[in-house]
Amino acid sequence: MFHATTILAYKGKNKSVIGGDGQVSFGNTVLKGNAVKIRKLNNGKVLAGFAGSTADAFNLFDMFENLLQSSKGDLLKAAIDFSKEWRKDKYLRKLEAMMLVLDRNHIFLLSGTGDVVEPEDGQIAAIGSGGNYALSAARALAKHASLDEEELVKSSLQIAGEICIYTNTNIKTYVIEDEK
């Protein structure tokens, strides 16, 4: 479990949204409260978030973005190629990290063990220490509330931040909307 962050991704009817809290913890100390752990990739057509160490995040984001470019924006192909590279590289294989990536068609959880997991519902995924809280809140809100996709992500992360001591409520989101 990564005691550093909560990232939530939601693929709704009209928008895909990723959000993350801003807390960076080191042991039992909060080092920073306004970190940004999510990114827009592929000219804003792909969103990504990271749970794990910050130094590892930059390396993995760059590696994923390069594979995304070489696959001409094909998220599925990039995710599979990324997972293969991550798994077979001696250094990267030791990283304890996870990523969420999504576009308007897919949402994937990627891990250093080679996993490429699409959520069963194809809509909601979460990682990090508050991930289960955010995931539970998002599922309940998606089923019982009529919130905009971005508000659903923000509300779910707010709930996680109120429960998980490694998650704060300084929430950042990025959105991909359907092209009109």
Swiss-Prot record:
* InterPro entries with a match to the protein in the record: ATP-dep_Prtase_HsIV_su (IPR022281), Ntn_hydrolases_N (IPR029055), Proteasome_sua/b (IPR001353), Proteasome_suB-type (IPR023333)
Respond yes or no to whether keyword Magnesium is given for this record: no
Q: How does it assemble?
A: A double ring-shaped homohexamer of HslV is capped on each side by a ring-shaped HslU homohexamer. The assembly of the HslU/HslV complex is dependent on binding of ATP.
UniProt keyword terms in alphabetical order:
Allosteric enzyme, Cytoplasm, Hydrolase, Metal-binding, Protease, Sodium, Stress response, Threonine protease
Q: Which GO terms describe its cellular component?
A: HslUV protease complex; proteasome core complex
Report activity regulation. Answer: Allosterically activated by HslU binding.
Instruction: Kindly state which reaction or reactions the protein catalyses.
Output: ATP-dependent cleavage of peptide bonds with broad specificity
Q: Which SUPFAM superfamilies is this protein grouped with?
A: N-terminal nucleophile aminohydrolases (Ntn hydrolases)
State the family named in the UniProt similarity comment for this chain.
Belongs to the peptidase T1B family. HslV subfamily.
Q: Give any single GO term for biological process.
A: proteolysis involved in protein catabolic process
Identify the EC number(s). 3.4.25.2
Active-site residues are T5
What does the function comment of this entry state?
A: Protease subunit of a proteasome-like degradation complex believed to be a general protein degrading machinery.
Q: From the Swiss-Prot or TrEMBL record, state where the protein is found.
A: Cytoplasm
Name by which UniProt lists this protein:
ATP-dependent protease subunit HslV
Q: Which residues form a coiled coil?
A: none
Name the gene: hslV
